[in-house]
């Protein structure tokens, strides 16, 4: 059975979204494990940037501050796929030694190249709320 252009467009978008969710999971696990080399592989081969709280990093090694009891979790992913480009906005939750530390928002750009999805830019803006009010239990 032949698919229409619209059916193929929707299917490709869904496949891209699923792959980007997997990219996020891998990125978070590598960050939490303190695996700098692995974490960097979630970004495009060259030209990727990372911005945290307004500070831009073009050398991703200098941006890395994971591991050492830190756990990064992302939720509420809003992903838009357009061919080989995609954008994402999601919520970041940061835990240290299993205690909630901070929440924020990632705004990401992705590219499909070399058979997979990668971050081209990742911008993290932390929320400006006191720690004890950020995640009521």
Q: Whereabouts are the PLM-identified features?
A:
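C-terminal-biased regions
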Residues: 2-6, 71-80, 125-128, 135
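A solvent-exposed, acidic/Ser-Thr-rich amphipathic alpha-helical stretch
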Residues: 30-94
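Short solvent-exposed loop/turn micro-motifs enriched in small/polar/acidic residues
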Residues: 22, 70-72, 101-103
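Short, low-complexity N-terminal intrinsically disordered segments enriched in polar/charged residues
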Residues: 1-33, 37-42
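Surface-exposed coil/turn segments at beta-strand junctions on protein surfaces, enriched
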Residues: 81, 99-101, 112
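Short, surface-exposed beta-strand-loop junctions and turns on beta-sheet-rich folds
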Residues: 94-96, 125-126
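Short beta-strand edge/turn micro-motifs at domain boundaries
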Residues: 87, 103-137
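Conserved aromatic-histidine-acidic binding/catalytic patches
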Residues: 12-15, 67, 98
């Amino acid at each position: 059975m032949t698919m229409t252009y619209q059916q193929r467009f929707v299917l490709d978008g869904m496949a891209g979204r699923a792959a980007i969710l997997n990219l996020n999971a891998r990125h978070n696990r590598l960050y939490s494990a303190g695996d700098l080399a692995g974490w960097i592989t979630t970004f495009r081969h060259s030209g990727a940037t990372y911005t945290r709280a307004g500070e831009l990093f073009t050398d991703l090694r200098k941006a890395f501050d994971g591991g050492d009891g830190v756990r990064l979790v992302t939720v509420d992913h809003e992903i838009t796929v357009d061919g080989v480009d995609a954008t994402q906005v999601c919520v970041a939750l940061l835990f240290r030694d299993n205690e909630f530390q901070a929440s924020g928002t990632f705004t990401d750009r992705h590219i499909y190249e070399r058979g997979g999805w990668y971050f081209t830019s990742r911008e993290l803006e932390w929320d400006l709320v006191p720690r004890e009010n950020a995640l009521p239990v």
